[in-house]
Amino acid sequence: MKTLITAIVAVLATATVAQAQSAPDLKGAWSGKFRTVILGSNPHHPSSGAADAPRVREITFTFDIEGQDGRLLWGKSWSNPERKEPFVATVTADGRTIIGADTDGSLTMRIGGRSRMDACYVHPATGPSQSIVASCGALQRAR
């Protein structure tokens, strides 16, 4: 009996480790509506001046995951197809959470199934534009 329990525990532990190390195939375009608050101006969110009051916008945001190596992802993201930015990300050990960064901000995503992810993006006023952005939305995989 002790041998059987040990064998079952070993099989379950191996399955859990394998599951934590693998990630679903996420390559392709993911797009959706995001509610965004912007303080200041930048190329993605132009305004009449850098000292503007916070503005709320609804935008369509796209992540094109061009490559994947296990839990590592990379590609381009944009709210304006003329201003695509590179990003890199990784799926965490839970197999559902993604964290990453682009040239001036960071993103957190949660995989909700084969064709849905929830995502949030922020960037601080450390870049040349000195703008601050926070945005969240739901992404659908393009068919």
What are the roles of these predicted feature ranges?
Residues 22-24, 31-47, 90-143:
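Beta-sheet ligand-binding and adhesion/scaffold domains
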Residues 26, 59-61, 135:
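Residues that flank catalytic or metal-binding motifs in active/ligand-binding sites
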Residues 27, 53, 69-71, 81-85, ...:
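Exposed regions on extracellular, virion, or secretory-pathway luminal proteins
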Residues 6-15:
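Bacterial N-terminal signal peptides
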Residues 1-4:
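Positively charged n-region of N-terminal signal peptides that target proteins for export
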Residues 41-86:
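N-terminal glycine/threonine-rich, aromatic-flanked beta-hairpin/loop signature
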Residues 16-20:
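Sec/Tat signal peptide C-region and signal peptidase I cleavage site
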Residues 29-33, 62-64, 74-76, 118-120:
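Beta-strand secondary-structure signal
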